[in-house]
Amino acid sequence: MGKKIRVYELAQKMGVDNKVLLEKLHEAGIDAKSHMSVLSEEDVEKLDEAPAKVERVEERRITAGVIRRRRKEVPQEEKAAPPAAAEEPSSVDTAVAEEAPAEEVQPVSDQPEIAVEPPPAGKQEEVAAPAPEPKAEEPVVEEVIAEPAVEEVVEEPSAVEQEEHVETTPVAEEEPKVEEQPSVEAESKAVSGELEESKTADQSKGQSEAAEVSVTKEKPKVEKATANRAKILGRVELSTLTSPPKRQERAKNGKGRPERPKGAKPSGGPAPRAKEAAPQAAVPFDGGPAPDKEVRGGKKGKKGKGNSYDKDKGFADGGKGRRARRQVYEPERDERRMRRGKKTPKPQKKTEVTVSKAIKRIIRISDVITVGELAKRMGVKSKDLITELMRQGQMVTINHPLDFETAAILASEFNYEVENVAFDEENLLADTAAVTEEGDSEEGCVPRPPVVTIMGHVDHGKTSLLDAIRATNVTGGEAGGITQHIGAYDVSVDDKKITFLDTPGHEAFTSMRARGAKVTDIVILVVAADDGVMPQTKEAINHSKAAGVPIIVAVNKMDKPDANSDRVKQELTEFEMIPEEWGGDTIFVEVSAKNRTNLDSLLEMVLLQAEVLELKANPNKRAKGAIVEARLDRGRGPVATVLVEEGTLRIGDPIVSGLHYGKVRTMTNDRGERLEEAGPACPVEVTGLSGTPTAGDSFHAVESEKDAKEVATHRQRKVREQELASTSKISLEQLYARMQEGEVQELKVIIKADVQGSVEAVRDSLVKLSTDACRLVVIHTAVGGINESDVSLASASDAIILGFNVRAESKAAALAETEGVDIRFYNVIYDAVNDIRDAMEGLLAPTLREKHLGKVEVRETFHVSKVGTIAGCYVTEGKVLRNAQVRLIRDHVVIWEGKLASLKRFKDDAREVQNGYECGLSLENYNDIKVGDIIEVFEMEEVKTSL
């Protein structure tokens, strides 16, 4: 009881497959779920006690195994068959029935020895009476078939009785038959070794006695069954042996086994048993038509004998068991494979049609994404997206970048949503600009100095006025006496501070004036009393109104004798600027910067206007402001002039401006004094940035340098993506335009200046010179001196270098001379613009213009051999030159145009003939000259093309 065994171990001992053993266990009522299930000794004994059920199961599942066992019993009969020679099937049946009860125990041991021998039909004759050897082989087969029928009624006892019958009948067995028996036994062991073990166990326990009793009770039935079975079995074996592939048909024949009685003589008693046994024995034995043929004709049986005998030998080698297993298991495997093959494509189609959840149909992208990446995230083929974009009129490729708006529209076509998850620098800057000590409430804000921008037309005295206020001389330091930089200054007036921004008045510095108007609180519009309103004056008014900044008009140069302030006021009324004394709200102050008159009144008006505006700021926040100007200093690096608008900027604060970031290393005011901190409305020069920021950009002080770097890196990446997106977009029209531009001349320039604002001014002024015939392309701009990299770039791109208020390094100058690069230096923007205009005009091809010289009238023609027609002419106007071009006109229609071949006067060659003289001339390669024709004389001259 204590010893247990697993199913697979028991199967190995019994030589049976795990599946077969599991089926036997289930039929025996033993619960075993898998090959790893544990069986007790009681279960094993229970399995041994139910051999009949196991045999029946084996007959259904493994037909080959059951057939072989019974065939093994047949060879024992075959041993007795050689002496018997009866051919009648009825006698065979009776003999078997009589001998069965006599020897029931012996057949059990003989069953494993029985082998299926080729001639089944002869066995019937052997049982009835001794006959020739070939016939004896046939009855052996018949007995084997009879056994399964007996087993159907009584499982093992029937087999035992049959074996006994076989032993009684045989007198002597042939040696070759005995040799075949062991081979069949080996096959039966391989396929159904369990059945033999179960039979031996049953015999040892005494089941043989019970079998004898059951057999004796059913003797008449057994006899009929054996007779029928003998016939059927012999025929079945022949068919199986002759055609091994027909084993699949055996099952069919077994199901139709009731048809066999048609050809069998003893159909009375055994017929019903054959039907009962058919479901079990039908599986092991082949169909009925084969036995019918044997009964009807011996010739067919003999043919079947020979073929089946040879094949039986082949089957006896051990292939039979394998084929039986294949019949049982392989069809199921094939069906499974076919099922799997059919099912596999279905889930694939379903996955294509499946719709993801709504939350999964949201695609998060940055500002720009490529077509391929968008298709990958959407799970859509790239070609589908490209097709949709082409339908919308965009010619793209898989690597084409899409902006957020285009991606959103495209994704909506495929039922997807696009969410922009780009780095939100505004939130970061808003968080870092949080109040450190006090909130943005009224209590935390304090009055701040006003920011005043001085604007006006060039040479109207803006800088001179600021110099008079600051008591300095800025104009003297400017090249050409005009301001070319934007300056920020801090002035104290009656213990109050005013921040002044001085902007250039030249037309090239429009962007500077626009920046000055944006960051200012009050605008002082300077108008010369002797000039009145000029173009830049109008522009300054427009900038101020666009920024919503109040304007104070300063009428300058009142010291001149031709000054007329009323004319200025009258002209400004056109721009809705009416003086207060005329009932308006615009403040007018008449000043003289040269004589420093009425400056206090101007400053008083500025402070009054600032009080009205109630300018306040919170100094307790992180600093925020604007870049007024930026330049590259050789000793200090990038230097930025900043105007703090909110908060307080301190040394060491990390700041970010445009594409650059860094920590504040030093701060100095306009007088060169070092500062530790700068409050609202305080202009300072800052060093420590990674590069020169663009003038007009805003700057922010952030919490850490890491945040500053993150913001700057994000901006740089965004700029690169936008450049890539802009350069890759091109339509067919643009492509055609570019092809046409192949004939357009280009002048490439590199601009280097001392400050960023000057770079922008020079660039904008030069770009305006571009025309359809000649275009100016600025390939590089930077702040600082001209270095070797600039020269190398110019050499590679055939460009010229313009230096504005900068000089070239010694190595760069030497390299430029070697490479033949043209470097030009300027201090005044006028000179740079004029020189570039001349250079662009030099690139253009000269224009050809026709110059009229005179007219002649043909009065006579002469024909000279080998020369042609000579026209005698009279010069009616102008003159005729020998190498001039002429045009022959007849009846006001141009007949011919070409050159003069010769020009003579009185047989002498003439260089020219003046008006009122006669001459003779001939045309080059043309002789159809008639009297009355008019010849026009002209020449083509080249004229320089201007922009």
UniProtKB/Swiss-Prot annotation:
Region feature (G5): 592-594
Record domain tr-type G: where: 447-616
Keyword Protein biosynthesis included in the entry's annotation: yes
A molecular function GO annotation: GTP binding
Residues covered by region (Disordered): 69-353
Record's compositionally biased regions (Acidic residues): 139-155
Segments of skewed composition (Low complexity): 81-108, 264-284
Residue ranges of the region described as G4: 556-559
Record keywords, A-Z: Cytoplasm, GTP-binding, Initiation factor, Nucleotide-binding, Protein biosynthesis
Pfam families with a match to the protein in the record: EF-G_D2, GTP_EFTU, GTP_EFTU_D2, IF-2, IF2_N
UniProt region (G1), positions on chain: 456-463
Binding site for GTP: 456-463, 502-506, 556-559
Main localization (coarse): cytoplasm
Region of interest (G3), ranges: 502-505
Function description: One of the essential components for the initiation of protein synthesis. Protects formylmethionyl-tRNA from spontaneous hydrolysis and promotes its binding to the 30S ribosomal subunits. Also involved in the hydrolysis of GTP during the formation of the 70S ribosomal complex.
Protein name: Translation initiation factor IF-2
Originating organism: Syntrophotalea carbinolica (strain DSM 2380 / NBRC 103641 / GraBd1) (Pelobacter carbinolicus)
Gene: infB
